[in-house]
Amino acid sequence: MADGFSLNDALAGSGNPNPQGWPGAWGNQPGAGGYPGASYPGAYPGQAPPGGYPGQAPPSAYPGPTGPSAYPGPTAPGAYPGPTAPGAFPGQPGGPGAYPSAPGAYPSAPGAYPATGPFGAPTGPLTVPYDMPLPGGVMPRMLITIIGTVKPNANSITLNFKKGNDIAFHFNPRFNENNRRVIVCNTKQDNNWGREERQSAFPFESGKPFKIQVLVEADHFKVAVNDVHLLQYNHRMKNLREISQLGIIGDITLTSASHAMI
């Protein structure tokens, strides 16, 4: 299921090759236009343009309010999972527009978390098993973010996107299945499991923090772990609006679980 991937792949079928709120490429690849934060071509942040008054900084230079996509500063609303400011959480919603670019600062915004954990999330933990409501179901451009730490000697992690008793998307990293590490994806309808899809790439480590991000698209889910694209799972249940809950279980300490539209 894992394969080569690009920004155009991530946005396939959206009708917009570069929609607002998606400044970075999927999988933490730098976007077009050079390294984020290049305020003046070739100039060190804060350096005046040719002919400027000594010490005068060009617009959007550092320090001071940054322009769109300038570094440091927050990402655009809902950006996933492109580069962010120091201490900021990749992909968390930022305010529309620029903020003063104090290194490590992250402006408060609805749904945002303070940057206190290893991925900029608050220190939990939340109780596992944990059920997160998805009011109105899931829909294209919805981004679900789960942050936590794998317990030592872990056996498995499970995410279940549920429609009543059915499971639209079962994401199940297994740390020791016949002495192998594998990720199993599946769907359960009318109490019957479908055909398993297995993934050998395994980015989780016992005792280590992780960030899982699930992006809902019109015909599939995309999953990235620690800002790297992992797999794609085609929808087997077509009525996405009926997928109204995410269940999180397994051998983890859960720090946060959130969703946002991008």
UniProtKB/Swiss-Prot annotation:
GO terms for cellular component: cell surface; cornified envelope; cytoplasm; external side of plasma membrane; extracellular matrix; extracellular space; glial cell projection; immunological synapse. The modification Phosphoserine is found at residues 6, 200. Keywords: Acetylation, Cytoplasm, Differentiation, Disulfide bond, IgE-binding protein, Immunity, Innate immunity, Lectin, mRNA processing, mRNA splicing, Nucleus, Phosphoprotein, Repeat, Secreted, Spliceosome. The keyword Cell inner membrane does not apply. InterPro entries: ConA-like_dom_sf (IPR013320), Galectin-like (IPR044156), Galectin_CRD (IPR001079). Signal peptide: none annotated. One of its GO terms (biological process) is regulation of extrinsic apoptotic signaling pathway via death domain receptors. Residues 37-46, 67-91 have a biased composition (Low complexity). Sequence repeats lie at residues 35-43, 44-52, 53-61, 62-70, 71-79, 80-88, 89-98, 99-105, 106-112. PROSITE patterns: GALECTIN (PS51304). A beta-D-galactoside binds at residues 193-199. Residues 1-102 are annotated as: Disordered. A motif (Nuclear export signal) lies at residues 238-253. The modification N-acetylalanine is found at residue 2. This is Galectin-3. The lineage of its organism: Eukaryota, Metazoa, Chordata, Craniata, Vertebrata.
